[in-house]
Amino acid sequence: LPRLVGRAQAMGLAMLGDKIPAERAVQLGMIWQVVEDEQLQAEAKKLAEHLAQQPTYGLSLIKKAIHAAAENNLDEQLILERDLQRLAGRSSDYKEGVQAFMQKRTPEYKGC
């Protein structure tokens, strides 16, 4: 939490235990987005559909890098990201993305 919101904010949040309005959680960087209750299902479906059209293998590598960044020092993170870039560059989705770009068409990712 301190890495996410800073030491002072983390101390206040943890020690006071106050409820945080959703908008404040967005401001602190604790969550990404707020939607109205009645829009939650529709927004979740829209997001899932969007992500499913993306290069899911590449997205998994992005998640790995972001999660590791919380624990790694800079040198460790740079090495990890280099290695992940190599993996991504060898994937079928990478090749499809480049071909689609060159052919000016929408890519059709397969998740590998």
Where do the language-model regions lie?
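Crotonase-fold acyl-CoA enzyme core
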Residues: L1-L59, S91, E96, R105, ...
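Bacterial helix-turn-helix/winged-helix DNA-binding modules and their immediately adjacent linkers
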Residues: A44, N73-I79
